[in-house]
Design a protein with these regions (language model features):
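Helix-loop-beta substructure at the N-terminus of cytosolic sensory domains
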Residues: 321-364, 538
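Bacterial carbohydrate/catabolite-sensing allosteric modules
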Residues: 1-49, 53-317, 325
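Conserved long alpha-helical elements within nucleotide-processing catalytic cores of c-di-GMP signaling
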Residues: 477-500, 507-534, 543-547, 551-552, ...
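Catalytic-core segments of nucleotide cyclases and related cyclic-nucleotide turnover enzymes
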Residues: 518, 563-570, 574, 585-621
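Amphipathic HAMP/coiled-coil signal-transducing linker helices
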Residues: 317-321, 457-478, 484
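Amphipathic alpha-helical "output/dimerization" segments
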Residues: 428-448, 457-462
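Short hydrophobic/glycine-rich mini-motifs in sensory/regulatory modules
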Residues: 412-422, 433
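A short, aliphatic-rich beta-strand micro-motif
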Residues: 397-400, 404-413
Length: 621
């Protein structure tokens, strides 16, 4: 099986699924044994540079040399450093690289011939509609498509003996708001309007038309407008916008054809173009082209709106479910269930295992991924839950079953720190609902909130441990008797489980301190604490009650277990010449006595043992 990598950056919050659809359609039409791996981010959407760093890190995940061909959709990468970095990696990977709608020396260009349709539009405007004053309403100055369209515009001006001073070029973005701003600036400047705005795309054209109407102008009565791309907002706008049709799915299909020719050793042109067509409409003074079915369009929009509402409701429901979760495992279960309701064939979550620990000092990678710590947290495929022992096992599964399928890899990160990534198989819903960023960001924000909450809980637990620990001996202190032992006693008492209360006091400790010094006395206390804790049965506690007094507590107690505990402790300490007195009291399951009452009885038992030992020594003397 051959593997193709598609490196892409979303357009704002949207993902261009048409490339993927065209690629997979062509692979299946030809019945080729090929899999598509898409690595997509949204590095141009956030204003937070560190967040964008975390997005672009997904490009560091693949071993590019392991692919048979690579397709770069880099026209939306606005970070110059990131753009140069990925281009350099691709130039050095030793694999044939195709670039979509962006010419890069050494790569094969696949896309539209941006110059030819602009020449055709300019000729039409000049010869058919008599335009003599032009403005090119452009997109980003450094965007390749915009650059090519500007170049063709300039060629035509030169051909007609016109200058840029009289026929200027405007630079902005590719969005609707750019067109609105262009029109406002013209109105506010008081400049004479041109005969035509030649726009870099349909978004800009629609913005100009709409804003012109706000100021009392009408297109095409007062001036003409043309667009590019043949988006719905061109075909169904009022006025219908003259535009250029380019089929993005055909670009995807052409990518497959070019790679097949390369793999077969056949000659391939450096630039590979899809057919494009100028579509003339009302905005340039031509009649409605009649190529649209308004009722069918409205029907599709209504159905799409209903479906979008359903998808949004599912996302809102997921958000509410995740907010009620107590841990990451539960969150991942809900997310996987959510994706099973969408039109996709599978999803896998690969995350750094440090996510689950949520230690307060945890750091995640900024460059690349901590592969030795990556685990498959959860996933499904074809409505069946899947589990993998390692990421390597998942990767082998993807390769073994990947033929004629598309895998989408998107980053999971907390700002610049990379936690892992999500793998989605055949996300067909993205064609009708391209706002995948909304889904992805909701999931990531929930994971980050859970992580920070766990960090706070862990930090609070550490502080509580310090608060409940005796600094000298390291065992629980008297506060822990109230905070830990007392609640434990109440729990076992309610369940009818007998417990043992043990009261311990060091014999003649004042004399030890006076004779050998306080440092020696401290070591005696430390040793008593160690032995008490080491011999304490499971689920039990030992605490320093004060001075040379200690308390032991353990459940599921019997007289034999209690006697065994005291015998072992005293035997070990006696061998080290450390003498203690111990009193034990067993609780009565279901009784009404308080723990303090039982402790008082244990204290009395300890005191009796201490007195007996003193009497015994007197008799010996």
């Amino acid at each position: 099986m051959k593997k193709i990598a598609l490196i892409s950056d979303g357009w704002r919050r949207m993902i261009t699924y048409a490339w993927v659809d065209g690629i997979i359609r062509r692979i299946r039409e030809l019945d080729e044994d090929i899999a598509l791996y898409q690595y997509n981010c949204y590095g141009n959407w956030s204003k937070d540079a560190l967040h964008n760093t975390g997005e672009y890190n997904i490009y560091n995940l693949p071993d590019l040399s392991a692919f048979d061909g690579i397709i770069l959709d880099g026209s939306n990468i606005v970070d110059v450093w990131q753009k140069e970095k990925i281009v350099e990696r691709l130039q050095n990977c030793g694999v044939p690289v195709l670039s979509l709608d962006w010419y890069i020396s050494g790569f094969y260009y696949v896309g539209a011939d941006n110059r030819r349709p602009i020449r055709e539009l300019m000729t039409h405007l000049y010869e058919v509609h008599g335009c003599r004053r032009f403005v090119f309403a452009g997109g980003p100055e450094d965007a390749f498509g915009n650059f090519e369209r500007v170049a063709a515009y300039c060629e035509c001006l030169k051909k007609y003996g016109m200058t840029l001073d009289d026929n200027p070029i405007l630079c902005g973005d590719y969005d609707y708001e750019t067109g609105v701003n262009y029109m406002r600036e013209y109105v506010h400047s008081g400049s004479k309007l041109p005969d035509v705005f030649v726009c870099a795309n349909d978004n800009i054209a629609a913005g100009i038309c709409a804003e012109a109407e706000q100021w009392g102008y009408r297109v095409p009565d007062d001036f003409l407008v043309t667009g590019f791309d043949n988006l719905d907002k061109a075909a169904y706008f009022r006025p219908q916008i003259t535009t250029v049709f380019q089929d993005r799915e055909e670009i995807g299909k052409l990518c497959v054809d070019v790679l097949l020719r390369i793999w077969e050793g056949k000659p391939v042109e450096e630039r590979n173009y899809i057919p494009v067509t100028c579509i003339y409409g009302e905005s340039c003074g031509c009649p409605n082209n009649g190529m649209v079915n308004y009722r069918e369009y409205l029907r599709e929009k209504i159905v799409a709106t209903v479906k979008k509402d359903e998808d949004d409701s599912l996302l809102v429901e997921l958000e509410a479910q995740m907010a009620r979760c107590n841990g990451f495992r539960e969150i991942f279960e809900y997310i996987v269930d959510y994706f099973q309701k969408l039109r996709c064939d599978g999803v896998y979550f690969v995350v750094d295992r440090k996510l689950f620990a949520a230690d307060e000092d945890t750091d995640f990678p900024v460059e690349g991924y901590d592969e030795k710590n990556l685990v498959v947290a959860d996933g499904f495929e074809n409505h069946k839950r899947m589990a993998f022992a390692s990421v390597g096992e998942l990767n082998r599964h993807l390769e073994e079953t990947g033929s004629q399928n598309a895998y989408l890899f998107t980053p999971i990160h907390f700002r610049e720190q990379s936690i892992g990534y999500l793998v989605m198989k055949n996300g067909r819903f993205l064609y009708d609902n391209p706002y995948y960023y909304d889904i992805h960001s909701t999931i990531v924000k929930t994971l980050e909130t859970q992580f920070k909450q766990k960090q706070l809980e862990n930090a609070a637990n550490k502080l509580q441990m310090l608060y409940n620990r005796d600094p000298l001996t390291g065992i629980c202190n008297r506060i822990a008797y109230t905070d830990i032992i007392r609640p434990a006693f109440a729990k076992y008492q309610e369940k009818g489980i007998a417990c043992a209360l043990v009261f311990v006091d060091a014999d003649d400790f004042k004399s030890v301190n006076d004779t050998y010094g306080h440092e020696f006395g401290d070591q005696v206390l430390i040793r008593i604490a160690q032995v008490l804790e080491e011999e304490c049965p499971q689920q039990g506690y030992v605490c320093r009650y004060g001075g040379d007094e200690f308390i032991g507590f353990f459940p599921y107690a019997t007289s034999e277990k209690a006697q065994q505990y005291t015998d072992h402790v005293q035997s070990r300490l006696t061998k080290e010449n450390i003498m203690i007195s111990i009193g034990v009291e067993l609780t009565f399951a279901g009784g009404e006595e308080t723990i303090d009452e039982y402790l008082s009885l244990a204290d009395q038992n300890m005191y009796r043992q201490k007195q007996m030992r003193k009497e015994s020594r007197k008799n010996i003397d």
